[in-house]
């Protein structure tokens, strides 16, 4: 499948359709509840998806309302992060480039960056470099410590209340259960690898 996001979205096709019927009302409700500190995120459902290597990747399925909350927080973070990373766009970093508030899409169109990435590879090869390193960074997402994330978001000057709320959300979304266990286990690390709404 060429678009990994399509697989994630397939789990929610009916939910997205139902949400869309009254999306304005739903979004206003989420906002109102959030402003009153009453919106409570739900635990994520975990799905294990086979990787080409034969290993399994855990994907967190967040309910639609939680996806919107997550996206709203990520938008705030991305805006601040862009101020620090923009100078590296299409020079050292070529993937998942934040498009900015004014864009309809979260990321810059990848095809343009890919052309520049390919040109950069050719330039490096012409300069005598003959090795390429390939990393599976998505495996890293499960190990991101929430205390470390808090530290770096604070360094970015993200509002502390927003960071604390995000950490509470992440704690719930990344918790685990035993198959017969009576309650969730909160381990304080990881960020959901789905939704990929911020990559769409």
Question: Can you describe what each PLM-predicted range is?
Answer:
Residues 119-200:
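Conserved polymerase palm-domain catalytic core
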Residues 40, 50-56, 114-117:
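Short linear interaction motifs
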Residues 6-12, 50-55, 182-190:
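A short, surface-exposed helix-loop junction/capping segment
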Residues 74-134, 139-145:
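Active-site-proximal segment of RNA-dependent polymerases
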Residues 1-50:
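Non-catalytic, polymerase-adjacent accessory regions of viral genome-replication enzymes
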Residues 56-92, 141, 186-200:
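Conserved pre-motif C helix in the palm subdomain of viral-like polymerases
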Residues 40-45, 83-88, 161:
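Short, flexible active-site-proximal loops enriched in glycine and acidic residues
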């Amino acid at each position: 499948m060429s678009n990994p996001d399509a697989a994630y979205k397939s789990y929610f096709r009916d939910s997205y359709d139902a949400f869309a019927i009254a999306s304005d009302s739903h979004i206003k409700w989420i906002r109102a509840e959030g402003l009153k500190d009453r919106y409570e995120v739900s635990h994520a459902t975990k799905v294990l998806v086979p990787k080409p290597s034969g290993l399994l990747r855990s994907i967190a399925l967040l309910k639609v309302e939680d996806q919107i909350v997550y996206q709203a927080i990520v938008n705030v973070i991305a805006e601040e992060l862009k101020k620090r990373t923009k100078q590296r766009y299409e020079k050292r970093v070529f993937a998942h480039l934040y498009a900015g508030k004014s864009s309809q899409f979260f990321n810059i169109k990848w095809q343009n960056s890919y052309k520049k990435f390919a040109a950069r590879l050719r330039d490096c090869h012409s300069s005598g470099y003959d090795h390429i390193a390939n990393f599976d960074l998505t495996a890293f997402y499960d190990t991101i410590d929430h205390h470390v994330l808090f530290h770096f978001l604070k360094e970015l000057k993200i509002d502390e209340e927003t960071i604390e709320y995000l950490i509470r959300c992440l704690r719930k979304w990344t918790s685990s259960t035993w198959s017969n266990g009576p309650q969730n286990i909160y381990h304080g690390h990881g960020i959901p690898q789905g939704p990929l709404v911020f990559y769409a």
